[in-house]
Amino acid sequence: MRHLITTKDFNKVEIMELFKEASDFLDEKPRTFLEGKSITTIFFENSTRTLSSFESAARRLGARVLRLDVSRSSSSKGETLYDTAANLDAMSPNAIVVRHANSGVPLILAKHMHCPVVNGGDGKHAHPTQALLDLFTIYNHFQGNVEGKKICIVGDIKNSRVAASNIELLSRFNLDITLVAPPHFMPNTHLKKHYKLDENIIANSDIIMSLRTQTERHNKTVYASLKDYANDFCIQKSLAKDKKLILLHPGPVNRNIDISDEMMSDERTLVLKQVKNGVAIRMAVLKKLILENEG
C-alpha cells in the first residue's frame, strides 16, 4: 500500500510523471478516472485552500467526497487515533486526506488503513502536495530548466512544514537554496543563511518563496509587532525592483507583512497560478495512488 506522507514517497521519475499528468489536468475539464470511488477528507486543523483544493481535485476526477466534521467527531471526545483509523477504514474509502496539528499523525493512520493516505499537512513536519505544486509552478515557468535555479525562502522557516517539504524536494532537483529569516525562525541547516532580507539577496535570486509567520506554532511572542517583522522580511517592490524573478507564497498571504500590496498585484507574483496548479497536482496524486492501489 502506497501513501503520500512526505515528498520522499515519490521518486524523481514518478514526480515527472505527475507533472505530465497535471499539465493535462490544467484544462479543468471533468474526468471519470475515479468514477464510483469515494475520498474522505478529515482535517483536524482549519483549512480553506488545501481542503477545497483536494475536494475540487477529487470531484474533477469523478469521485465522491465525504468531509468529516472534526468538531463533532469522536476524536474530539477522546477517541484514540487507532480507533479513529479503524472507524475510517470500516467505511471503505478509496483514499483519505488528513491534516493534523501534530507531526506524525498521517503516518500513524496510514499504518492502520487499507487505502492510500495523503498528508494534507502535519504539524511542522511535512506538506508534500504543497511542495509538489510549488515545484510544478517553478518547472512550468522555467520550461523544465530548474537545475541550478536560485531560490530564496523567506520567513518562518523553522516552524513551516511547507519549507521542510520544499527544502527536501527542491534539493533533490538541484535548485540552489538560500534561507532568509530571523535567528529564532532559522532551522539548523547546512544551507546558505541570511538574517535580513536585502536587495542584493533578491538580485541574486530567480525565485522568492515567502512564508507566513506561523504564530499558532509559537510558544511565546517573538516580535513586538508584525510590523517590526515586515520591516526586515516583507517582499516589497523597492527591494525587487525590476529583477526578472517569480514570487511564490503557499497562502494565506499576510499582506504588507509577508508581501506588499504592490507586489501582490505584480505580474511576477504567481500565487493564483499556484492555486490553479495545486488542483491539477492533487488530481494527479489521487489518481496515481488510488488506481495503483487497485491495479
From Swiss-Prot:
It comes from Campylobacter jejuni (strain RM1221). L-aspartate binds at residues 77, 161, 212. Belongs to the aspartate/ornithine carbamoyltransferase superfamily. ATCase family. This is Aspartate carbamoyltransferase catalytic subunit. Heterododecamer (2C3:3R2) of six catalytic PyrB chains organized as two trimers (C3), and six regulatory PyrI chains organized as three dimers (R2). One of its GO terms (biological process) is 'de novo' pyrimidine nucleobase biosynthetic process. The keyword Secreted does not apply. Pathway: Pyrimidine metabolism; UMP biosynthesis via de novo pathway; (S)-dihydroorotate from bicarbonate: step 2/3. The keyword Transferase applies. SUPFAM superfamilies: Aspartate/ornithine carbamoyltransferase.
